[in-house]
Regions:
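Conserved catalytic or regulatory cores that recognize and/or transform ribose-phosphate-containing ligands
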Residues: 1-199
Length: 199
């Protein structure tokens, strides 16, 4: 039976107690039969710590390799993405990249993308809320909402940019309020893939 390997994406790595958060999430996944992988498991070599460019390259390469490892050798690759707004109305940009990376892998591998966020306001509502004056400052051109600078506000009612939500939907995932709900959905989605007789 194919193993489910989950990459834990999100801005959690920037939060206080980031390592403990990762340990707790991996322990929870283990109770569900999922093998978890957390970006902070990739230790930056001491020799690179004084060279920001080399250190950042090491981190980026290591995270990509970790995602690749989640779906190699017939594994079911799962990404559990914390989509909470980070430093703005949208999700963490690094997490968005990782969702895109796994989305690309899904065309060649068995990958499921699942998001979670306690913030239930739509993407466009959060964007408007970040603009001085909120919705009162928004104008409409042929039904399209525009910010005061004239740029269009994406308004599809999704939890974030359409490229994120469409990738989640295409791979059979969804967006949930909590990590625990997302993880449980990952098990169910993985079992559906197993039931398709791929292995």
């Amino acid at each position: 039976m194919a193993e489910i390997h989950a990459y834990l994406a999100g801005p959690d790595v920037f939060f206080p107690h980031a390592r403990e958060t990762g340990r707790q999430k991996i322990a929870y996944l283990k109770t569900l039969g999922i093998i978890g992988h957390y970006p902070l498991d990739n230790e930056v070599p001491a020799a690179l710590l004084n060279d920001p460019a080399k250190a950042s390259r090491f981190i980026g390469d290591a995270n990509e390799k970790m995602m690749l490892d989640c779906c190699r050798d017939g594994r079911i690759g799962l990404i559990l993405a914390n989509m909470c707004p980070f430093h703005g109305p949208s999700m963490d940009v690094g997490t968005a990249f990782e969702v895109g990376f796994m989305s690309a892998l899904s065309y060649r591998h068995n990958v499921i993308i699942i998001g979670y966020t306690p913030y239930r306001r739509s993407f466009e509502d959060r964007v408007a809320g970040a603009i001085h004056g909120g919705w009162d400052a928004i104008t409409y051109e042929n039904g399209v909402p525009r910010a005061p600078d004239g740029t269009m506000i994406e308004a599809f009612g999704g939890a974030d940019n359409l490229m994120i939500t469409s990738a989640i939907a295409r791979t059979g995932g969804d967006i949930f309020a909590t990590f625990e709900e997302a993880a449980q959905a990952g098990v169910e989605a993985g079992n559906r893939l197993r039931g398709q007789g791929t292995w």
